[in-house]
Amino acid sequence: MAELQQTDRDVRAHEQAHLLAGRGVVTSGPDYTYTYGPDGKRYATGGEVGIDTSPEHKPEDNIDKGVRIQAAALAPKDPSAQDYQVARVGVKLETQGRQDLSQQQ
């Protein structure tokens, strides 16, 4: 049961980190997956926070949003594979914004 309690704390801290760093890009959550322990209590064993990765209309906004997506995705001390995947979307959005901005100048 101590392992479930630790997992619950870790999962909640992980998702909270996404929320705190995700100003303006977090769309939902945290949503948790629960497991019942031998004591009959629910323990969070997984979770997710929705992050808006859709492009904006202006290059400057895409740069800003891409940076914020990366910050939100990589905020936990132990990013998951999904977190790294979302961060890559942020990198692409930021890069595209920078390319579009340089073409306008």
List PLM regions with ranges.
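Type III/flagellar secretion export determinants
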Residues: 1-105
